[in-house]
Structure formats: C-alpha cells, structure tokens
C-alpha cells in the first residue's frame, strides 16, 4: 500500500502488503481525490457488467450442458470452464461492494481469505482448462486414430479433477497470508506476507522492510505468472501453431475461419492477462517506476483480466459453427455449439441436437481434421 512516510508506522508496509488487484484491492493514494473517485466508479461499473454478463452467460452454459446435452469430452471442458467462471462471477459482488465503500472491508477475516482464494483458484482453473482444451484439439489433429480410441468422457473428468486440485494448491497461499486490519479508520483486506500483527513491534516499518515477507511476496507473484500465464500461453500458442501447420500441410483448411478463431483465442487470452501479470511483476521493484503508473495501470489491467471470465462463452461457444447467423435463436446456437465434438465445424446451426449428435458420431476422420479449430 502506498502511504506517505510519516504515516507508514501505522499502515501496511509496501513490501509486506501485496496489493492483489485481482480481488479489488486497489490503492489510490497516488491519485488526486477526483482521479481516485473516477477510478473507483469505473471499477464498480466494469465489475458489475462483467458480473452480470458472466453469471448470465456461464449460467446458461451450465444449465444447457447439464440438462440438455449429451455428455461428450468437449462438453466436460465447456462445463468445467463455465463453472469456474461462474464461481468467479458469483463472488464479484463482494468486491464490488468493497470498491464502492472506498475499500472498507466489512465481511470479516474468514471471508477475506475465502473470497480471494476462490478468485485466484478461478484464475488457475480457467487457465489450465483453456490449456487442456488447446492440447486436446492439437492431439485430435496430430493423432486422430489414437484420439478416436482413447479420448473418453471419463478421462476428461479425471483431467478436470486434477486441474481443480492443482489450482487448489496453487491458490492456498491466500488462505494463509490473507488478513484484515484497521488502517486509517478503514478495515483493509490484504496479503500479510510477514504474518505479523499490524502496529505490533514485529510489524516492519517503511525503512525496515521484512526480507521474509518480501521473499514470500516474490515467490507468490512469480509462481502466479509462470503457472497462471507464461507456461499456459506457450502451450496454447504451440498447440494452435501445430494445428495451423498440420492443416496447411495437408490442405485441409478450406476457409480462413479456423485461423481467425485461433488468432482470436490466443490474442484475447494474451491481452486479458498480460498487463495484469506484467504490472504485478514490475511492482516487485516498485521504486523504479512512479506510483501513479500502478495506481492507474493496475485497476485497468485488473478490469481487463476479470473480463476474461465473461468472454469465454463468446470465444468458445458463440464463435463456433455458424454462430453469426442472426436468424437462429440463442438457445439453439448454444445447443449447437456445445454439442460439437472436437474437430467438427461444418454442421448448419439450425439442425436439432438429436440429429447433430448422431452425425457427430458418424463423422469421418478427414472431417475431424478439416474442422479442427
């Protein structure tokens, strides 16, 4: 938290309080009162829009996938992705309230830990699911026969279980370090990496930054960057580049549409998360840059990052087969997209789910490669 030096003994030291902007911990002391107010209003508006669209879009996907669709491997991916994003959006109102109340936390220490844990857990779960979707599609293109024989719903559920457990462990620092404290008449929800009590003799001052707390801060930040962004982006990019090369070499791509979808998926994911992780890495060496860069940049980067939770239904469903045909009802479009098996992209969107399911099962290997996204 950026405080004036004379106030620092009664506040959270910068090296100890990790301003986790993903859950609305936005510190605006480097901004003018007007700028700070405008920024808070902006965040409340953006978070509210994301919350509404995310709950509506992901909720609709969950309902259709659970009650209307035949269980396929793709269905398992889409369902888990929607559940992860839905949980993220459900807890956004807490952080919308936090921002609206000028960052005064009224929900208690336990909820401070749990809410942040769920948000970070969603980040890892969503990223890992997007990665496994890309890997699954790549394998289906490179090894169609193996994929046909070994790709099963049971295996997909097992993979999702591993993803959720792995995300749990990577998010567990929030349950340990998350804390609340009364600072300047407000209750703050923050990361207390020194695990000391604010205001106590063990609480580090501005000139006496806790090296252990800073080390923990660095480990958490770098781990989130590597596991939650860099490695998944490299895998996703490699998968789709491999798919593009395979389709071009075999001359299976009849249109440019699959390539547009591939580019859109990669660029959108990169744009949503790159600013957030980059600024958090730079913040480890915050003295090298003006505080206003983080006060303005991190809220904007955070808004962009959380927007990914409501973009996924658009990118992975509405950009599917023939979704630009306005005459088709929304429900039919969702059913059509969610019933697609990996590699199918040539069915008219007005066909019924029953007919599509039977056709999916009879589709040849060549069609699977041709339509692979």
Curated annotation (Swiss-Prot):
Main location: membrane
Residues listed as glycosylation sites in the UniProt record: 9, 192
Induction context: Up-regulated by inflammatory cytokines TNF-alpha and IFN-gamma in monocytes. Up-regulated by TNF-alpha, IL-1-beta and IL-6 in endothelial cells.
Topological domains annotated Cytoplasmic: 65-75, 136-154, 246-261, 321-373
Region feature Disordered, mapped onto this chain: 341-373
Modified residues (Phosphoserine): 339, 349, 352, 358
GO MF entries: adipokinetic hormone binding; adipokinetic hormone receptor activity; chemokine receptor activity; complement receptor activity; G protein-coupled receptor activity; signaling receptor activity
Disulphide-bonded residues: 112-189
Topology Extracellular: residue spans: 1-41, 98-114, 177-224, 283-300
Keyword list, A-Z: Cell membrane, Disulfide bond, G-protein coupled receptor, Glycoprotein, Membrane, Phosphoprotein, Receptor, Transducer, Transmembrane, Transmembrane helix
CC per GO annotation: membrane; plasma membrane
Membrane topology annotation: Multi-pass membrane protein
Residues bearing the modification Phosphothreonine: 342
Localization: Cell membrane
One BP annotation, GO: skeletal system development
Matches recorded under InterPro entries: CML1, Formyl_rcpt-rel, GPCR_Rhodpsn, GPCR_Rhodpsn_7TM
Residue ranges, compositional bias (Basic and acidic residues): 364-373
Biased composition (Polar residues): 344-363
Family indicated by similarity: Belongs to the chemokine-like receptor (CMKLR) family.
UniProt function note: Receptor for the chemoattractant adipokine chemerin/RARRES2 and for the omega-3 fatty acid derived molecule resolvin E1. Interaction with RARRES2 initiates activation of G proteins G(i)/G(o) and beta-arrestin pathways inducing cellular responses via second messenger pathways such as intracellular calcium mobilization, phosphorylation of MAP kinases MAPK1/MAPK3 (ERK1/2), TYRO3, MAPK14/P38MAPK and PI3K leading to multifunctional effects, like reduction of immune responses, enhancing of adipogenesis and angionesis. (Microbial infection) Acts as a coreceptor for several SIV strains (SIVMAC316, SIVMAC239, SIVMACL7E-FR and SIVSM62A), as well as a primary HIV-1 strain (92UG024-2).
Protein name, UniProt field: Chemerin-like receptor 1
Taxonomic lineage from the root: Eukaryota, Metazoa, Chordata, Craniata, Vertebrata
């Amino acid at each position: 938290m950026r405080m004036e030096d004379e106030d620092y003994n009664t506040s959270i030291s910068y090296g100890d309080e990790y301003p986790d902007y993903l859950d609305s911990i936005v510190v605006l002391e480097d901004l003018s009162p007007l700028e700070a107010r405008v920024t808070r209003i902006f965040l409340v508006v953006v978070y509210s829009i994301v919350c509404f669209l995310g709950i509506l879009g992901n909720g609709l996907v969950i309902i259709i996938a659970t009650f209307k669709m035949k269980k396929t491997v793709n269905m398992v991916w889409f369902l888990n992705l929607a559940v992860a994003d839905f949980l993220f959006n459900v807890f956004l109102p807490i952080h919308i309230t936090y921002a609206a109340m000028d960052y005064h936390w009224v929900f208690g220490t336990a909820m401070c830990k749990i809410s942040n844990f769920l948000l970070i857990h969603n980040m890892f779960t969503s990223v890992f699911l997007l990665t496994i979707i890309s890997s699954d599609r790549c394998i289906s293109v490179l090894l169609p026969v193996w994929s046909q024989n070994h790709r099963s719903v049971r295996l997909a559920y097992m993979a999702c279980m591993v993803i959720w457990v792995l995300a749990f462990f990577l998010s567990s620092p929030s349950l340990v370090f998350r804390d609340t404290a009364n600072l300047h008449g407000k209750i703050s929800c923050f990361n207390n990496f020194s695990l000391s009590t604010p205001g106590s003799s063990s609480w580090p001052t501005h000139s006496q930054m806790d090296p252990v707390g800073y080390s923990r801060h660095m480990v958490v930040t770098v781990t989130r960057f590597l596991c939650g962004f860099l490695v998944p982006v490299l895998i996703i990019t490699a998968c789709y580049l491999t798919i593009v090369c395979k389709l071009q070499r075999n001359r299976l791509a009849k249109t440019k549409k699959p390539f547009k979808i591939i580019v859109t998926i990669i660029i959108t994911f990169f744009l949503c998360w790159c600013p957030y992780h980059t600024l958090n890495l730079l913040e480890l060496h915050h003295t090298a840059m003006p505080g206003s860069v983080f006060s303005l940049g991190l809220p904007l980067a955070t808004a962009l990052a959380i927007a990914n939770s409501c973009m996924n239904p658009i990118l992975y469903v509405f950009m599917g087969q023939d979704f630009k045909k306005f005459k088709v009802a929304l429900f039919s479009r969702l059913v059509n997209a969610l019933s697609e098996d990996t590699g199918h992209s040539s069915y008219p969107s007005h066909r019924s789910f029953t007919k599509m399911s039977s056709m999916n099962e009879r589709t040849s290997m060549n069609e699977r490669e041709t339509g692979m996204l």
